[in-house]
Regions:
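Conserved catalytic motifs of ABC-family nucleotide-binding domains
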Residues: 157
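A short, surface-exposed alpha-helical micro-motif characterized by mixed small hydrophobic
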Residues: 202-204
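Catalytic Walker B motif of ABC-type/P-loop ATPase nucleotide-binding domains
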Residues: 161-165
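Conserved ABC ATPase "signature" region
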Residues: 103, 107, 114-132
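ABC ATPase "signature
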Residues: 220-221
Length: 255
């Protein structure tokens, strides 16, 4: 298989529900290789569920996910070897230190111990976690947990990164560092799929994006195509049928 000519991620007819209405309702999506792809949508739109199915963390009721041509469910070993994942609400081994977590992750992936040690050192330094490398993960702040989670996703040098809200709870300095890392990753030929609620972030980082609403893709294309003549936030509100509130009621707040 020529993975270089395959889409970085292809989702075909993904469906998922949890006993009620469809949370993901027939999602089809193609992420070209080498792209910085944004996934946006209102709260509860199905973004996290879609990404969880895309990388094999959640089994779909129907549909397929391929990472560089490898089926996530029928060929998980090859698919998961070339993807790095930062899920929302990542559960980490709480009783390991940051350094131990990276070492454990690398060895579990079958990486050479010397390579694991070298990359662990670099990642801890670049993400400013060196001072906390011997601190238990249970004692990490929300932002530190996000950074160590990103480090585990980067450790094995994947071809595709799938990141669910990677900058949430991260301080501005660390956020800029992470943005630089991701931009360098794409410039070197990697592919990124990133979900976020921050339109300015998506607009500045991504070259392509998809808008999900009520479990369906309502728009997909380049940022310029979806944005049109106005701001991306205006296009987003129009596409999801949102209503900007806050100008009525709550009179008691000023009393």
């Amino acid at each position: 298989m020529d993975i270089e000519s395959s889409p970085a991620l292809r989702l075909t007819g993904l469906y998922k529900r949890f006993g009620g209405p469809w949370v993901v309702d027939g999602v089809d999506l193609v992420v070209p290789p080498g792209s910085f792809f944004g996934l946006v949508g209102p709260n509860g739109a199905g973004k996290t569920t879609t990404l969880s199915m895309a990388v094999g963390l959640l089994r779909p009721d129907a549909g397929q996910s391929h990472i560089f041509g490898f089926d996530v469910w029928s060929d998980p070993v090859h698919a998961k070897t070339i993807v790095g994942v930062l899920p929302d609400g990542l559960a980490l081994p709480e009783r390991l230190t940051g350094r131990e977590l990276l070492t454990y992750t690398g060895l579990l992936r079958g990486m050479a111990p010397a390579t694991v040690a070298e990359r662990t050192e670099e990642l801890l330094a670049v993400l400013e976690l060196t001072e906390a490398e011997n601190t238990l993960v249970v004692d990490y702040s929300a932002g530190m947990r996000k950074k160590i989670g990103l480090a585990t996703a980067l450790l094995h040098a994947p071809k595709l990164l799938v990141l669910d809200e990677p900058l949430e709870a991260v301080d501005p300095v660390s956020a800029r560092t992470i943005r630089t890392i991701l931009q360098r990753f794409v410039a070197a030929g990697g592919s990124v799929v990133l979900s976020s609620h921050v339109m300015a972030l998506v607009e500045n980082l991504c070259d392509r994006l998809a808008v999900i609403n009520r479990g369906q893709v309502v728009a997909a294309g380049t940022v310029a195509e979806i944005r049109g003549e106005g701001a991306l936030e205006e296009a987003f509100v129009r596409l999801v049928g949102g209503r900007i509130g806050g100008d009525e009621g709550l009179a008691w707040l000023a009393s």
